[in-house]
From Swiss-Prot:
Entry's Gene Ontology BP terms: methanogenesis
Organism: Methanocaldococcus jannaschii (strain ATCC 43067 / DSM 2661 / JAL-1 / JCM 10045 / NBRC 100440)
Name recorded for this polypeptide: Methyl-coenzyme M reductase I operon protein D
Keyword Cytoplasm carried by entry: no
Pfam families listed in its UniProt record: MCR_D (PF02505)
Domain of life: Archaea
Signal peptide: none
Subunit structure: MCR is composed of three subunits: alpha, beta, and gamma. The function of proteins C and D is not known.
Keywords on record: Methanogenesis
Length: 164
């Protein structure tokens, strides 16, 4: 199966509202398979130092809604890696970026995400779990943090199949 990966790098960190609008627009595209948001973490609590354990009340750590699915924003969006099933909608993706990021952005096509199980996948899920992921949903490959629960780090937004 031919997949294309696109990196979108806005020239500024995005607020939660802009991230929500952007994600909803790109999920309207038919060829979008997977979106990974990368950026500065927005922790719930301070993890080190004299204030360790105190809550962090960051204004941008919010629950956004992407196609009706609530997604907890745990990073300040600074980069998006988008997997497309083909390159037919690259121009539409570029138009969405021009509309949403008047301050500028970079759009690159390349290889940014894992497509084979990693050692971390085997540690987290075990050999049987990796086999199941390979058979069921390959979008989850390479999407693990060995120290986190999957429910905290990955949200699946299902695409609506439009009947024609």
């Amino acid at each position: 199966m031919f997949m294309i990966e696109v990196e979108i790098f806005p020239h500024r960190y995005l607020k939660a509202s802009t991230t929500e609008k952007f994600l909803n627009k790109i999920y309207d595209l038919k060829t979008v398979e997977r979106v990974v948001i990368h950026g500065q973490p927005l922790p719930k609590v301070i993890t080190y130092g004299p204030a360790r354990g105190l809550p962090v009340n960051h204004t941008e750590r919010k629950i956004i809604h992407v196609k009706g699915v609530p997604v907890e924003l745990t990073v300040m969006a600074g980069r998006f890696w988008i997997t497309l099933s083909d390159d037919s909608e690259l121009d539409k993706l570029d138009e969405i970026c021009k509309e949403m990021f008047p301050f500028g952005y970079n759009l690159r096509v390349g290889k940014f995400l894992k497509d084979r199980p990693t050692v971390t996948d085997y540690i987290k899920y075990g050999e049987d779990g990796v086999f199941l992921i390979n058979e069921m949903d390959r979008r989850l490959i390479g999407m693990v943090d060995p120290r986190s629960r999957m429910a905290n780090s990955v949200t699946v937004v299902e695409k609506e199949e439009k009947e024609e």
